[in-house]
Regions:
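Buried hydrophobic positions in well-ordered alpha/beta secondary-structure cores of metabolic enzymes
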Residues: 29, 72, 119, 131, ...
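Short glycine-rich phosphate-binding loop at a beta-alpha junction
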Residues: 62-75, 109, 224-227, 338-344, ...
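Glycine-rich phosphate-binding loop plus the immediately following alpha-helix
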Residues: 153-181, 325-357, 415, 420-424
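Phosphate-binding and adjacent anionic-ligand microenvironments
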Residues: 288-290, 314-317, 337-549, 553-557, ...
Length: 591
């Protein structure tokens, strides 16, 4: 978010504001910001503009019509539907969304506190738009919302026209007389607290039934599962579905304060807590098969496999976190996918296993890019299309038929489907969840990040090690003598000048000063620029440096032949004060 200055006339709302507005930015996961800056006015301006954009689209592209129902829901963050005294009294974001829906000529329908995929699925089935108020996995002091067309998520191509309408709406609303405006000088509704309409439960029921119907005839009987509830909006739904499908479920860890769970960045403290849950449940109930959970808005799964040794007749559990990119492989195999789309950050076990022939070109990171890739696969005639992200959020780009049951396409991240597919794959193959994952190619991943890392610095790091020629997507270094092969995003070889080759070699040499052989890295064999800088080493290590798309964070993704090595790469990356990422940042400053 960055401040805005707009010429104002005396008596206009903009002139009456007692703060400097920070406009929300369009991102691949919607619009997010610090709650202290999320005035109801700012939410309203953006939502009105996005609704106007949806109304401008033809029906076949997900357009909506004035007078239609428009669905909305929220997660369990305090600011989503209540004022938060700890965050400057901001909040009641859902109330601002509801008013924007009304003023855009739509009929708002509150589906309550349900998972993002539950809202999206319900709206798509009815050819209606939707908005989810959520900050997903980010800390509670941040929040936001995500708009869906009647077909699904907004995509990257929508960004420019949406932002143009936001600018127009901002100017129009700021220019209104302050005395007649809905908003006070603090950017909040003059009317104060507003109670939302009682939620309709039909969206929740439909989401539960979606999975009960698809897995009818199959049972999880005999599975003992821990459901880590924390503050996930889908915590009760998760327990309900698992129990209805026959599992014994032990709910644990329920929290009435918001707990940010980033399924792509489970730290040691979180993993230790979940292992404690496993040990306590095992001692009380006997051996458990897995711990399952989701992030805050329940569109990303979290799965911990549990295998047990028995010593003197007593179970000793061994719990292992299963990366979302590996969860996606098991899920797509179970569903019989003939096309799979993943971002470049995913574990490359996919490239080596049973789905390698179904693999479409890897995309940039973010569900809109995965969705665009799935649409390309559909255009090529593929009929069982799946996609997923490294965080485990799983998308279906086509209807999926299995055992004479049909699962309707849901082109947005979902946590419930991968959790269920992993469990049923385990049952069908007569293996524990851990044994099931042990059959995958032996490639191990880990991600970590530095928080409060200025985005401008992150972008400079990426730019420093990126060729100026924008067509270059891949650099291959097949020999140590200095040959370089250049490829574009379609994997077509590019001709290159001597200057291009020298620059590529300089980039490799520069990166080698940070990813040192003394730290276990081999010579650099390839660099990919699909999203950030992804570095491949001759010893099969992979290190990927990328700025977060929606926060001041710099991430490092690692893939290696052992989990220990993947963990070591991320530790080297985020170590303080002299890890690789900090060293890269310092190298930008003149000595």
């Amino acid at each position: 978010m960055e401040s805005t200055t707009i010429a104002t006339k005396p008596g206009a709302l903009r002139a009456a504001l007692n703060y400097e507005p920070l406009p929300l930015k369009f991102g691949t996961s919607g619009r997010r910001g610090d709650v202290v800056h999320l005035t109801q006015l700012e939410i309203y301006i953006n939502a009105v503009a996005e609704l106007e954009y949806l109304q401008s689209l033809p029906r076949e592209e997900g357009g909506i019509t004035r007078g239609d129902e428009f669905f909305y829901a929220s997660d369990l963050r305090p600011s989503s539907s209540h004022f938060d005294s700890h965050l400057g009294g901001r909040g009641e974001i859902a109330q601002a969304i509801e008013r924007a829906i009304i003023d855009a000529g739509m009929r708002p329908v509150n589906l309550g506190r349900i998972p993002t995929p539950a809202l999206t699925s319900y709206a798509i089935e009815r050819n209606r738009g939707s908005i989810m108020v959520t900050g997903s996995h980010i800390p509670f002091e941040r929040n936001g919302y995500k708009v869906n067309t009647a077909r699904g998520e907004l995509l990257k191509k929508d960004e420019v026209p949406v932002n143009r309408l936001v600018d127009e709406a901002r100017a129009r609303i700021y220019d209104q007389p302050a005395a007649k405006s809905l908003f006070n000088a603090s950017g909040m509704f003059k009317t104060g607290h507003h109670k939302l309409p009682d939620p309709k439960t039909s969206g929740r029921r439909a989401y539960v039934q979606r999975y009960i119907d698809f897995f009818t005839g199959h049972s999880l009987k005999g599975k003992r599962l821990i459901a880590y509830e924390h503050s996930a909006v889908g915590r009760d739904i998760l327990v309900e579905i698992l129990r209805k499908l026959g599992a014994e479920v032990i709910p644990t860890g329920r929290s009435e304060t918001f707990v940010p769970i980033d399924t792509e960045n489970i730290d040691d403290a979180q993993l230790a807590l979940m292992r404690q849950f496993v040990e306590k449940a095992t001692a009380k109930h006997g051996p458990v098969d897995a711990l399952v959970s989701t992030d805050g808005d329940s569109d990303r799964p979290l799965i911990i496999s549990v295998d047990n040794d028995f010593i003197d007749g007593q179970p000793r559990p061994h719990a292992r976190f299963l990366g979302g990119d590996l969860v996606g492989i098991i899920t797509a195999e179970y569903l019989g996918a003939d096309a799979v789309v993943v971002p470049i950050s995913c574990n490359d076990a996919l490239d080596l296993g049973s789905l390698k022939e179904a693999l479409e070109p890897k995309t940039r990171i973010g569900s809109p890019f995965v969705i665009a890739g799935m649409e390309k696969a559909r255009a090529k005639g593929r009929s069982r299309i799946c996609g997923w992200e490294a965080n485990g959020g799983f998308l279906t780009g086509s209807d999926i038929c299995r055992n004479q049951k049909t699962l309707k396409a849901l082109p947005t991240r979902d946590a419930m489907l991968p959790i269920l597919c992993v469990l049923f794959a385990s049952v069908e193959r007569g293996l524990s969840v851990g044994q099931l994952f042990a059959l995958l190619p032996k490639r191990y991943s880990k991600a970590a990040l530095l928080k409060n890392f200025p985005r401008a610095t992150s972008l400079k790091i990426v730019s420093r090690f990126t060729p100026e020629e924008t067509r270059i997507r891949d650099l291959f270094f097949p020999t140590p003598e200095g040959r370089v092969d250049f490829f574009n995003e379609d994997a077509r070889r590019l001709s290159a000048s001597d200057a291009d080759t020298r620059l590529a070699l300089n980039i490799r040499e520069g990166l080698s000063k940070f990813f040192r052989q003394s730290d276990g890295f081999g010579p650099i064999s390839r660099i990919n620029y699909t999203d950030g800088v992804r570095i491949y080493f001759a010893n099969n290590d992979v290190a990927h440096v990328r700025p977060s798309g929606n926060a001041d964070e710099l991430r490092i993704y690692a893939v290696a032949d052992t989990q220990e090595r993947a963990d070591a790469i991320t530790r080297l990356g985020v170590g303080e004060p002299d890890g690789i990422l900090r060293s890269l940042a310092r190298s930008l400053s003149p000595h």
